[in-house]
Structure formats: C-alpha cells, structure tokens
Amino acid sequence: MADKITAKDAAEKKDGFVLIDVREADEIAQDGTIEGAVNIPLGQLIRKGRQGELDDLKGKTICTYCNGGYRGNIGADELNKKGFTAVTIDGGYAAWKEEKKKNTK
C-alpha cells in the first residue's frame, strides 16, 4: 500500500511533487483537476501505455490522485513497484477541493 498524504500537505508541498491525475478524461472535464497535474488514466499507467513519459519522472516524487483515493492508491502502488517514489492524496480530488474551500473562507 502506498504512503498517503493529506490534501492539506499536498497543497502545501504541491510544487515539490509531480502530480498525476489517474482519472479518465471525462471525469476531469466534468469536475476539474489540480492545476499543473498531468492526466495519465490508471489503465494507461498500469499497461505501460506512457512509459517513456514516466521514465522522465525517475528520481522525482510523484503524487497520484483520483476522485476519492482508491485508484490513486493503486496508481502509486504500481509506480512504487516500478521503482518510482510515489505517494497518494488520502481522499483524492474530493479531499483536495474540500481543503481548498477551507482556505478560501
């Protein structure tokens, strides 16, 4: 199981991560994404569909997320198995949006 970080910690350390949104494009179109995140759907992440792009991220800390956390955790696990350093946002994009609401009040 991948290490999890809170949405608050992810927001504070956002510039120190490569953010990967593992949701499908239609989910992002409907709900938005974290500014600066790269979209690599979980299926492509697992099937090596974008391995060249991923290889450029070796040595960097990757932070994955989905809407609620489940797919983000799977994505981080897969990346860690492949030799990357990856964590996931506990609660996913939903937690991120909630954290952003707290900070804009």
PLM ranges: what are they?
Residues 1-18, 25-61, 70-105:
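Rhodanese-like catalytic fold shared by cysteine-dependent sulfurtransferases
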Residues 67:
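Aromatic-flanked redox-active Cys/Sec active sites in thiol-based oxidoreductases
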